[in-house]
Amino acid sequence: MSAQTVSAPEIDIQEIPRARKRENVVLNLKAGDVVVVRSAREIAETLDENGTLDSLPFMPEMLEYCGKQFRVLNRVVQSTIDGAFLAGSHTESYVREFRNNDVVTLQTVRCSGAQHDNCQRACAIFWKEAWLRKADDIAEVSESNGSSNSLPRNLHLKTTTQPGKYFCQSSEFLKATLHLPMGKRIKKCFSAIAARNISVWGMMKRLFAWAWWRTYYKLIGESVRGSLEKTPTGVLDLKPGDLVQIKSLPEIKATLNSRGRNRGLHFSADQRPFCGQQFRVRNRADNFIAEGTGEMKHFQNTVMLEDVLCDSACFAFGGCYRSDLLYWREIWLRKI
C-alpha cells in the first residue's frame, strides 16, 4: 500500500474545532504511570490539517491503540536523531527535545509499519500527553465515555508527501523537536530521574560512559573498528523467534572497516556490552524509513533482537529515551 492518506469512517478532521489543540494538556506523566489512549474522536480534535500536534504526526498505525490501557515506558525528556542522517549536509543538533516537552513512550507499543509499506524499523511510538489520560482520572473517564471510539470518517492521516517520500514520526522528527544546548542537557539528567526513567546510580553510570567514550574517541578514534577495505556478508536467513548469540568483539571487528562499518552499517560502542549474549530475533530489518528524509531504505541480512535497545549513553550526554532497537548484521550473530 502506497497511498497518500489513510481514511477511516465517521469524522472529517478539517471540520473539527481546534479547541483542544491549543489547550495545554499537562499530565506530568512518569515511567510506570498507567494511562489510557483517548478515543479517535478526542485525538482528532487535537490535530491540524496535516494530522499533527506540535509537528508530531498521529499515524494510522496508532488508531488500534485507542481506548486501550498501557503503562508509560519513558518520559522522553531528550532524544537523539539517527547520526547517519546528520552525517550528510545537515548541521542539526544530535540531541533534541520535543516541543512543549510533553511526549512519552508506552510499554510494548511499537509501530507496525503496516500503513507505511511495511517499514520494519519498529519505532517506539511517541505519544503527546493530549492523546492520553490517566487511568484513575474519574472526571476524564466520565468525559471519555461520551466520546466515540469508532474510527473517524474521512480522518485523513498522511502516509506519504510525494512518491517515494513517507510521512511518519521518524520522518518529521526534526520538525517536532528543538535543539537541546548542553546547559539544558544537564537539567534534563535531573528531569529523567524525577520522571523515573532512570535511577540516580543509573544516570551516574551513563554520564561516566559518555565521558569515557568521548575521551576515547578524541584520543584514539572509532571505538570499534576493523582494517578491511571491502567488508564481508554473512547469511543466516534468520526468522522471528530464532535464538542467536552475538559474536565476540574480536570476531565482529574482523568484519569491519576502519570506520567501524560493515557494508555501511555502523557497529557502535552501545552494542559492545551485548557481545557474547544470547537473544531471540524480533524481526528482520529489510526495509525501513530513513530518519529525517522519509525515504525507504533497504538492508540485507540484518535483524533486530528482542529487548536489545540503544540508549545512546556513549554519545549523548544523559542518554536517549526513545528506546530504539539496534540493527545487527547476520555476520555478527551465531544461530543457536
Where on the chain are the PLM-derived regions?
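Generic structural signal for buried aliphatic residues
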Residues: 35-36, 104, 244
